[in-house]
């Protein structure tokens, strides 16, 4: 079957830059879906996305849909014929199929007609496939234009559809298909004739349009890095900003611009924020990570006088930097702590009080937590009291991303200790999955306190997160607490910290069972964390059964159990623990704590008792040092005496004293393993 390249390009007014790449991918996916449904094969595909166009190239597409057959079943044979004569049901089926009854297959249990459907020409199928793909694009809000009733993300301007070197005759979104595209708006305003689909990219390149999103992105990234190096700096190129800039230009030309050095007195985060978010510039840092008074803009034109473009961008950015400078100077006119007065009128949550109320709670809770993790209570309390002050500043009002960062600079300006200042920013860490953690113990204490206060407060008024709604980001808060404690190796008993947080709210929350509810929610987040790490859920549950209060201790136990499961003795010992657990659960009355050797009547009882005593002495110091892996490795040596015991000894002996003593022996055995985890749950 012959095949030809196919090209479709829809020209529009400027498309939303943040959505451009996803629109292109969705356009291709929709076309592939349509081609597959039509049974059309092809050898390759490529999507192109530029500010004024979406295009897809399909390589070596079948020019003819293959013929196919479908079987249509009719009535059962007993209903189709009576006394050898066709019934009305049989005749009706033949009429429905448009054939004589003689052409119907009568060899099976039912009448069957095999209908041959000849394939259609691909050119006749493509308009519907393209139209369906465009209709299925993820466009939140479509628009109409002029007198047209058509709707799309932006008004359409032209349409190219070529199968081989032939135009596919159709009209889509008010545009009649042809072979004429358009070049760069300034460099090549004339139409561009696309000779063949394979020449599409090069035809547009000659017209100063780089249609390939990936090519433009790579060019911008490479040229920006080169220019930064020439300025003895490194460019800040966030992937999302690079994508957005790529979507804004058809013919990218990066240029170096500058601003007055006096603006460097403003916190560089504020300058970077305004230049990235508002102007789409790439900022430059020196070797020490300090902002340079230069930036890179990406022009969409190759100017004969690039200085004009540079000066224009420098003129545009100056007022924005001046605003940031003004806010910074205004805020510094008063001590940071005085901004707490404004927060007394800002509601955190209607039932839980103001933002200032929250800051006071965080201060006390941070002071409680700090010494427990090796920090300073006084400095943590001070940082907690200042933690929300910058929310009332002019800087954060203009640049919300500066919360915490602004507080850091203002605290330093007021002469606060370095760790107190850092904690004002670190309280929000981690800001996302895998993001940076607090570096100071003061910051860690405030970050944990802030998150626990939110968890306890919101749970305490019954606003639990649902599957789809978590307006206070409680899941992220819980994961943040766990990450700080585990990855920073901070041994904090969360039970005490959560109970302290509950008491602070007083009558504002329903305290009964609240601490337990919050702790369960926090430790439940560990399940997903471990699953992501490839740790089996049974390992998590074996530790969860003991309900450790420390996240660090919990993690150390999980890692130990995971290592234990790789030992050859693990499976058998897990099964034995399960058997012992079942036996002990059926014991009548309390199980004795002491084992009495005088009731032994089998050598294997003595052997197991001796092995348990030796293991107990060995693992006690290990348990005290939380050497859980070593402890389980030592307990693995109990497999042989345990197996011998169960092969030779009937636990439920007729003699009540002998039976009770054997229960006590098995309880000692199980207690050794429970010092780490309930490995009976591993079976």
UniProtKB/Swiss-Prot annotation:
Which cell locations does it reside in? Cytoplasm
* Gene Ontology BP annotations: arginyl-tRNA aminoacylation; glycyl-tRNA aminoacylation
Keyword set includes Cytoplasm: yes
**Top enzyme category:** ligase
Q: Which UniProt keywords apply?
A: Aminoacyl-tRNA synthetase, ATP-binding, Cytoplasm, Ligase, Nucleotide-binding, Protein biosynthesis
What EC number(s) does its UniProt record assign?
6.1.1.14
User: What binding partners and quaternary form does the record give?
Assistant: Tetramer of two alpha and two beta subunits.
The name this protein goes by in its record: Glycine--tRNA ligase beta subunit
């Amino acid at each position: 079957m012959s095949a030809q390249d196919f090209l479709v390009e829809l020209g529009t007014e400027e498309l939303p830059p943040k959505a451009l790449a996803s629109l292109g991918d969705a356009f291709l996916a929709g076309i592939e879906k349509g081609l597959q449904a039509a049974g059309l094969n092809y050898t390759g595909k490529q999507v192109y996305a530029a500010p004024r166009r979406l295009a897809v190239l399909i390589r070596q597409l079948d020019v003819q849909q293959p013929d196919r057959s479908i079987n249509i079943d009719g009535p059962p044979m007993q209903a189709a014929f009576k006394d050898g004569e066709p019934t009305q049901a049989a005749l009706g089926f033949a009429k429905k199929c448009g054939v004589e009854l003689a052409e119907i297959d009568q060899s099976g249990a039912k009448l069957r007609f095999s209908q041959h459907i000849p394939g259609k020409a691909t050119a006749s199928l493509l308009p519907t496939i393209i139209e369906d793909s465009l209709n299925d694009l993820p466009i939140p809000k479509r628009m109409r234009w002029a007198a047209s009733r058509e709707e799309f993300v932006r008004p359409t301007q032209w349409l190219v559809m070529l199968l081989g070197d032939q135009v596919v005759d159709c009209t889509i979104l008010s545009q009649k298909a042809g072979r004429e595209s358009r070049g760069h708006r300034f460099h090549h305003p004339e139409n561009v004739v696309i000779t063949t689909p394979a020449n599409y990219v090069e035809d547009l390149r000659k017209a100063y349009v780089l249609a390939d999103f990936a090519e433009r992105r790579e060019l911008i990234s490479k040229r920006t890095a080169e220019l930064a190096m020439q300025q003895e700096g490194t460019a800040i190129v966030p992937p999302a900003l690079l994508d957005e800039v790529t979507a804004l230009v058809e013919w990218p030309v990066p240029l170096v611009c500058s601003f007055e050095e006096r603006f460097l007195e403003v916190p560089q985060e504020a300058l970077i924020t305004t230049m990235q978010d508002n102007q789409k510039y790439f900022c430059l840092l020196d070797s020490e990570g300090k902002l340079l008074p230069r930036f890179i803009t990406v022009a969409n034109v190759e100017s004969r006088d690039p200085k004009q473009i540079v000066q224009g961008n420098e003129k545009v950015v100056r007022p924005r930097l001046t605003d940031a400078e003004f806010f910074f100077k205004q805020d510094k006119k008063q001590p940071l702590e005085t901004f707490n007065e404004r927060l007394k009128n800002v509601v955190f949550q209607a039932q839980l009080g103001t933002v200032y109320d929250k800051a006071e709670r965080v201060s006390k809770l941070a002071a409680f937590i700090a010494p427990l993790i090796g920090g300073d209570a006084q400095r943590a309390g001070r940082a907690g009291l200042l933690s929300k002050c910058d929310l009332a500043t002019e800087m954060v009002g203009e640049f919300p991303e500066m919360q915490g960062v602004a507080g850091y600079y203002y605290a330093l300006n007021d002469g606060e200790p370095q760790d107190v200042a850092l904690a004002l920013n670190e309280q929000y860490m981690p800001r996302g999955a895998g993001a940076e953690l607090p570096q100071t113990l003061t910051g860690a204490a405030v970050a944990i306190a802030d998150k626990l206060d939110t968890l306890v407060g919101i749970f305490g008024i019954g606003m639990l997160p649902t599957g789809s709604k978590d307006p206070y980001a409680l899941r992220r808060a819980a994961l943040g607490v766990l990450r700080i404690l585990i990855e920073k190796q901070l041994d904090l008993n969360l039970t005490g910290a959560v109970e302290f947080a509950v008491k602070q709210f007083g009558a504002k929350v329903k305290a009964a069972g609240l601490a337990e509810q919050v702790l369960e929610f926090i430790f439940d987040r560990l399940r997903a964390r471990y699953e992501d790490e490839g740790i089996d859920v049974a390992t998590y549950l074996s530790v969860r059964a003991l309900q450790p209060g420390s996240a660090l201790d919990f993690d150390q136990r999980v890692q130990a159990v995971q290592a234990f499961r790789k030992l050859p003795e693990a499976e058998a010992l897990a099964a034995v623990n399960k058997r012992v657990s079942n036996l002990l659960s059926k014991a009548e009355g309390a199980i004795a704590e002491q084992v009495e050797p005088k009731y032994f009547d089998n050598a294997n009882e003595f052997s197991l008792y001796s092995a348990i005593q030796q293991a107990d002495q060995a693992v006690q110091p290990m348990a005290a040092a939380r050497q859980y892996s070593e402890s389980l490795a030592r307990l693995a040596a109990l497999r042989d005496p345990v197996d011998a015991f169960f092969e030779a000894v009937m636990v439920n002996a007729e003699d009540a004293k002998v039976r009770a003593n054997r229960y006590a022996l098995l309880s000692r055995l199980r207690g050794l393993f429970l010092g780490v985890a309930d490995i009976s749950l591993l079976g």
